[in-house]
Amino acid sequence: MIVVQEEKNLLKAGVFAELTLADYRELEQAISKKLKAQRKLNLLLDLRKMAGFTLDVVWEDIKFTRSHPHDFARIAVITDDQWIPWLSWLGTAFTDADTQTFTDADAAEAWARGR
């Protein structure tokens, strides 16, 4: 399950349980809608309650990220999982966004907002 919140210069998404392709497509739609209103997007992903993801999500993420190489300014990822920072690092090959991982939600949100 995914919960997406739109704010002025930030799109926040929290993932609960397993991230499925349907969940990821919901995030894609929110991103695409937000990008129609602004040139670059700051994204905050809270993955602390994510229990895993399906393999089709990985492929969809690669395709989506490659189709938006210059559309993100900052991507903040909140996680306690040791593998997520590594996966985030791999994703930087497809985007010029400044990407950081955090364990503290407040620090992640402040950074994503540019503070």
Q: Can you name each region flagged by the protein language model?
A:
Residues M1-R115:
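Amphipathic, Lys/Arg-enriched alpha-helical "gate/interface" segment within cytosolic domains
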